[in-house]
């Protein structure tokens, strides 16, 4: 093997010539013949490599300097150029290090613990300039073809899916990335602790004490004996189909109905994935029913049934290894569970749990549209339905927890599901279904999706700093609201039959929601000193319209089975506007004041959580209501409403005393409205800030003053 180290060379010169360096090396002493001036007798010093001419001719070179014999004879320019240094071979030990590093990156990536900037490995580098090098992450592009090249979905025969968007993992080959069979997973997840060691202690014990956190660290347990009887299961399934499924459309009812009928007869034969669906259906069915219905159908109080099935849902998720699942039934069950829990648990805990659902969906590739990934038509529709339920749920969680963080619109390209009925799609279909015109089973969900997609579709611009969306001016807001209203009216509401409970609910909620958007856009006028009486009354009329629609939906007997949805949906802007104007003594006439308080009473009658719950938002609304009552109660001598009595009882220890405030001066009456002004200090009439996706279900997503409420003392 030739040495590639270049040595110093000597340039020979005649006695009358100058020394001319041919290489960047110190010159040696000239030969005696050179000193004596004998050019013809010049001695040469050989190079350690051939000249370029001899290399090309593939002839022997005597490597003389400055000109070899061959070049001198042929009168060619003799050029010596050293070979580039050869890349040193990696030792086997170094290869092992890179292989282990790639393996560890795969593990971290599978558990979403590897940041995008560190998602590459030095094992495939081309240079030796550094010990470890990383590639810059590929930017997310909206082009569906780009997504197809950047990542792919791997489907197994049992319907599992795994989305891969990492060059290393793709290079590893698809075969290594498939999920383990369920039988192997059981052995892999087997708890090796003894029975005495299985009970978590310390911090783990504190986590396990919380029913939800226990699902993260719990052990597998059989649920066969906890299934209801076949007759009870049939009743729960019918309740779910009637009360829940029309408003969620996460499941394909014909397919699940067959599975449900088979499994409810033989619970021991159910798979772990399907068992998650079974128990969440039981739980959600009970959640959607009243206490009287539960007692009549099952002879148990609603609270007792909810507690029982909530425990079994959590255990079923543990049994299915839900934190690393790639199975659609498990994520469908978990999403349904979160929808029911959204108003039942702490908002910060709910935000974390919703984040888990989003990560699982991204791991399964739901954030990429199935058509661009080449999936079957049935899979495409079901994945779209599930992802578009997670979007508003994630936005709701981010808003109610105060983080304001939700899925960035630039991180997904999943299209809305088609306007079709369940009988138009089925597993194994090869041709995409034809979308129908008019009202379908998807009418409620699609109407909500149009509103959720409102800001993304209508050409809004992003702020220079942050991810919130900002319109240019009030005229743009009004124009865009009109456009989305016309779109929804044309596509859906014009086909609604108000005798159909689902259509009646859809019409009421959507029109109420659009009015609430208009109200939100105009609410900052209340803070302006130049607002006219006519402008204020137009705002009041709009707010009253929203409250009246809400009360109408609640009072309609045909929509009683959808009340669970209405508990999570209320447009608080309208209530705030009414209370703000009630607090202005003299704005309402006595008859108008009585009518306004009647509308507020209806709100509290329909939303008893305003009195019972202790969430920050509800406590703030209660304080605002009491301020308005103490500043400007009705003029008649009717008895004090029950909701005011309950609020005074709860908040009197906090410093609100009705007796001390029974007679208010004009200054104190003005102070009664001062609390409202705090909600408008940072608002103006031209900006409308919404965090990412618009969420029809989120009360705080409608409530632009919610974050200011969180900064207001509740004492």
Curated annotation (Swiss-Prot):
Pfam families: Fungal_trans, Zn_clus. Disulfide bonds: none annotated. One of its GO terms (cellular component) is nucleus. Residues 51-78 bind DNA. Residues 119-144 are annotated as: Disordered. Signal peptide: none annotated. InterPro entries: Sec_Metabolite_Reg, Transcription_factor_dom_fun, Zn2-C6_fun-type_DNA-bd_sf, Zn2Cys6_DnaBD. Residues 119-136 have a biased composition (Polar residues). Viridicatumtoxin and its derivative, viridicatumtoxin B, exhibit anti-methicillin-resistant Staphylococcus aureus (anti-MRSA) activity. Moreover, viridicatumtoxin and a C2 acetyl analog, spirohexaline, have been demonstrated to inhibit bacterial undecaprenyl diphosphate synthase, a potential new target for antibiotic development. One of its GO terms (biological process) is DNA-templated transcription. Keywords: DNA-binding, Metal-binding, Nucleus, Transcription, Transcription regulation, Zinc. It comes from the Eukaryota. It is found in: Nucleus. Probable transcription factor that regulates expression of the gene cluster that mediates the biosynthesis of viridicatumtoxin, a tetracycline-like fungal meroterpenoid with a unique, fused spirobicyclic ring system. This is Transcription factor vrtR1. It comes from Penicillium aethiopicum. The gene is vrtR1.
């Amino acid at each position: 093997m030739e040495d590639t180290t270049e040595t110093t060379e000597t340039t020979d010169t005649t006695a009358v010539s100058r020394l001319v360096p041919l290489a960047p090396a110190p010159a040696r002493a000239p030969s005696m013949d050179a000193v004596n001036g004998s050019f013809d007798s010049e001695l040469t010093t050989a190079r350690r490599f051939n000249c370029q001419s001899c290399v090309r001719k593939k002839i022997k070179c005597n490597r003389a300097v400055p000109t070899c014999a061959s070049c001198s004879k042929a009168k060619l320019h003799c050029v010596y150029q050293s070979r580039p240094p050869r890349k040193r071979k990696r030792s086997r030990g170094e290869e092992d290090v890179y292989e282990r590093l790639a393996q560890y990156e795969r593990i971290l990536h599978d558990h979403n613990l590897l940041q995008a900037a560190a998602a590459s490995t030095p094992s495939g580098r081309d240079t030796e300039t550094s010990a470890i090098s990383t590639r810059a992450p590929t930017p997310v592009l909206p082009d569906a073809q780009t997504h197809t090249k950047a990542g792919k979905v791997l489907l197994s025969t049992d319907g599992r899916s795994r989305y891969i968007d990492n060059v290393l993992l793709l290079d590893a080959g698809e075969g290594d990335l498939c999920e383990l069979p369920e039988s192997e997973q059981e052995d892999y997840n087997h708890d090796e602790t003894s029975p005495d060691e299985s009970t978590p202690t310390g911090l783990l014990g504190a986590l396990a004490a919380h029913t939800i956190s226990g699902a993260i660290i719990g052990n597998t347990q059989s649920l066969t004996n906890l299934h209801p009887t076949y007759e009870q299961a049939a009743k729960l399934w019918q309740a779910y189909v009637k009360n829940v499924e029309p408003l969620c459309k996460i499941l394909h009812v014909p397919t699940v109905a067959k599975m449900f009928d088979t499994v409810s007869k033989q619970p021991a034969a159910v798979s772990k994935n399907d068992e998650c669906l079974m128990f969440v259906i039981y739980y959600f069915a009970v959640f959607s029913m009243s206490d009287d219905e539960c007692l009549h159908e099952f002879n148990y109080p609603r609270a007792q049934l909810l507690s029982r099935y909530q425990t079994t849902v959590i255990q079923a998720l543990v049994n299915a290894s839900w934190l690393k699942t790639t199975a659609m039934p498990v994520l469908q069950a978990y999403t349904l569970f979160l929808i029911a829990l959204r108003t039942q648990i702490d908002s910060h805990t709910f935000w974390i749990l919703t984040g888990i659902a989003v990560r699982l969906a991204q791991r399964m590739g739901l954030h990429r549209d199935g058509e661009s990934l080449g999936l079957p038509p049935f899979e495409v529709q079901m994945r779209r339905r599930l992802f578009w339920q997670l979007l508003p749920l994630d936005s709701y969680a981010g808003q109610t927890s105060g983080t304001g963080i939700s899925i960035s619109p630039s991180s997904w390209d999943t299209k809305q599901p088609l306007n079709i009925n369940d009988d138009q799609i089925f597993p194994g279909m090869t041709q995409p279904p034809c979308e129908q015109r008019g009202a379908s089973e998807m009418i409620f969900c699609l109407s909500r999706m149009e509103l959720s997609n409102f800001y993304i579709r209508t050409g809004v611009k992003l702020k220079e700093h942050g991810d919130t969306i900002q319109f240019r001016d009030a005229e743009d807001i009004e124009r865009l609201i009109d456009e989305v209203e016309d779109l929804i009216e044309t596509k859906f509401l014009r086909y609604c039959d108000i005798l159909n409970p689902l259509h009646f609910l859809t019409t009421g909620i959507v029109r109420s929601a659009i009015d609430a958007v208009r109200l939100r856009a105009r609410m900052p006028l209340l803070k302006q000193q130049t607002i006219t009486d006519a402008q204020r009354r137009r705002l009041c009329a709009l707010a009253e319209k929203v409250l009246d629609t809400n009360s109408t939906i609640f009072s309609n007997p045909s929509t009683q089975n959808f009340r669970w949805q209405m508990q999570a949906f209320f447009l608080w802007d309208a209530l705030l506007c009414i209370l703000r104007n009630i607090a202005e003594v003299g704005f309402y006439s006595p008859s108008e004041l009585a009518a306004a308080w009647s509308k507020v009473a209806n709100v509290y009658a329909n939303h008893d959580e305003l009195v019972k719950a202790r969430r920050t938002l509800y406590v703030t609304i209660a304080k605002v209501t009491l301020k308005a009552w103490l500043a400007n109660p009705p003029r008649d001598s009717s008895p004090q409403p029950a909701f005011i009595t309950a609020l005074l009882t709860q908040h009197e220890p906090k410093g609100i005393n009705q007796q001390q405030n029974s007679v208010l001066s004009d200054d104190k009456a003005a102070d009664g409205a001062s609390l409202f002004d705090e909600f408008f200090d940072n608002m103006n009439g031209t900006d409308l800030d919404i965090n990412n996706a618009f969420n029809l279900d989120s009360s705080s997503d409608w409530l632009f003053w919610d974050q200011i409420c969180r900064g207001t003392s509740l004492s």
